[in-house]
Amino acid sequence: MFDLRYHVASLAAVFLALAVGILLGVAISGKVGDAEDSFRAAEVERLSDRLQEEQERAVAARQRGEAADELVERTYPVLMEDRLAERRFALVFLGPVSGRARSAVERTLSDAGSGDPVRMVALDVPVDVEELDEALLADEELAAYAEEGDDFSGLGDDLGEELVAGGETPLWSALSSLLVEERAGTSTLEVDGAIVVESWSAPPTEDVDEAERIRATRSLLDGLLRGLDNTGFPVVGVETATSDDSAIDDYHRLGISSVDNVDTIAGRLALALLLAGGQPGNYGVKDSASDGVVPPIESVPPPETGA
């Protein structure tokens, strides 16, 4: 039988072990806490340094941007002067007229010596598939365009080519009441290029009939863009810097050059350079501008003088 002294000694040993454990735990937790505090302090310092670097880069970028804007603004009149002189252009809205885009395009052409667009057409979209089919089938010369059901890409191709060529335009004459919302200018003169503004965007829908109408409209618009491009003249799709719905992906998909900030000085310069035959690409300030702000700038050839 254990005596009292042994029992007391055992209890003392247990309490001593507990005390040592508590002291060690406190020491270790203190060290861990110190380590965590040190880590947090180092992380805060690292993030602070990184933020400072980003802020410095942002300031530098803003300063470069302001300098570039100032340079473009100062050189704009010289770079634009007569760049499009004696050239004629068509302005095409794939949807209703956008006043802001129209004003920017007209300003571009005026600044570059071209004057107002020779003709402007705004399409009435989405198309009414049944009415368009009926109109096509009622004319022997147009009936073939209705053979593909709701695919009007072939019709769009020929409409685009007619729009550039001018002169007699049998397709536009026959279908204007169905396809044209607004027009201005003359249709008789050939143009040297076209500016396109896609001002209509298809709304999301689960309605089968409406989805068919949207597909038919898209096929017509894509065909028209291809038809314009097939002429070999410059075709440029444009939008303003603040456009809610961007059409740049559509232009890019069809191989059409684009400017996404036509309502700015740099955008107007980019448009003029492209219409003058500059390097094709997607220009502007948005993420879609894969080729920079403006195309490479070439000098305007001096006017020819007699001997």
Named regions from a protein language model:
Residues 9-25:
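Hydrophobic membrane-insertion alpha-helices, especially the h-region
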Residues 30-79:
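Long, leucine- and charge-enriched amphipathic alpha-helices
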Residues 59-88, 94-155:
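Signal peptide-directed extracytoplasmic domains
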Residues 196, 200-307:
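Extracytoplasmic/luminal low-complexity segments enriched in Pro/Gly and acidic/polar residues
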Residues 1-6:
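Terminal targeting segments of Actinobacterial cell-envelope proteins
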Residues 115-116, 190-194, 231-234:
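Loop/turn elements at helix/coil->beta-strand transitions in domains of secreted/extracellular proteins
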